[in-house]
C-alpha cells in the first residue's frame, strides 16, 4: 500500500468517509483524470494500488501521525482518530502499533466514545502488555463507561508495572472513589 497516497489507500479499503476527509488535504494527482472523491475511488477500484515501499510507508505513517497529533491539539478528536486509523494501514511495527492504538484510544475518549476507546486500549494492552500507558488508557475508557471496578483493576495493573507513576496512582484513587460511590447509590 505504500508508494500510494493516504487517500488512495483509504479508497482501496472502501472508506469513503476517510476519502472525503482526506480530499481537501490532498494535492491533485496528474495521473487521475477525474480529481473528485468518486473519481479517486473509481480509479483505485479499476487500477488498484502500486507495490509497497517500506520507506514510503514509514514516511506516510509519520505524516499521518503528525496530522493526527495536530488535530488532537486543536480539539478535533474525530479527525485525529481517523488519521491514526489511516496510520495503521502503513505497516507499523508492533510497538508503533501500540502507540498508535493508545493515541487513537485517547482521541476517541476525548471525543466521548468510550466503547471505541476501550477497544483500542484493549488491543494496545495485547500488543504491549507490559506498558503502563496501555493500562492507563484502558482504565480511562472504563471510567467513561462507568465500569469503575474494572477501571480499578486496569489502573492497579499499571501501578504494578510502574509503582512510582503518579498519574496511575491518582487515577486509581479516583476509580476507587467512583466505585465506592456507585456501590453506595445501589444500596
Each predicted region: which residue ranges?
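Ankyrin repeat A-helix N-terminal signature
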Residues: 9-15
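Helix-start (N-cap) detector for alpha-helical repeat units in TPR-like alpha-solenoids
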Residues: 61, 95-98, 132-133, 166
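Structural marker of alpha-solenoid helical repeat scaffolds
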Residues: 90-93, 127, 161
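Alpha-helical linker/edge segments of TPR/alpha-solenoid repeat scaffolds
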Residues: 16-20, 28, 32, 46-58, ...
Amino acid at each position: 500500500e505504500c508508494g500510494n497516497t493516504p487517500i488512495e489507500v483509504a479508497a482501496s479499503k472502501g472508506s469513503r468517509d476517510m476519502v472525503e476527509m482526506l480530499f481537501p488535504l490532498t494535492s491533485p494527482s496528474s495521473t487521475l483524470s477525474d480529481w473528485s472523491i468518486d473519481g479517486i475511488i473509481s480509479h483505485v477500484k479499476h487500477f488498484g494500488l502500486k507495490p509497497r515501499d517500506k520507506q514510503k510507508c514509514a514516511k506516510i505513517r509519520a505524516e499521518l501521525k503528525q496530522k493526527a497529533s495536530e488535530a488532537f491539539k486543536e480539539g478535533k478528536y474525530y479527525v485525529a482518530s481517523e488519521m491514526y486509523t489511516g496510520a495503521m494501514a502503513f505497516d507499523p511495527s508492533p510497538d508503533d502499533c501500540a502507540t498508535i492504538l493508545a493515541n487513537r484510544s485517547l482521541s476517541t475518549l476525548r471525543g466521548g466514545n468510550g466503547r471505541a476507546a476501550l477497544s483500542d486500549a484493549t488491543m494496545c494492552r495485547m500488543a504491549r502488555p507490559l506498558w503502563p500507558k496501555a493500562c492507563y488508557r484502558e482504565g480511562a475508557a472504563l471510567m467513561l463507561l462507568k465500569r469503575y471496578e474494572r477501571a480499578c483493576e486496569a489502573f492497579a495493573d499499571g501501578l504494578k508495572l510502574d509503582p512510582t507513576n503518579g498519574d496511575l496512582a491518582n487515577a486509581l484513587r479516583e476509580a476507587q472513589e467512583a466505585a465506592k460511590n456507585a456501590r453506595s447509590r445501589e444500596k
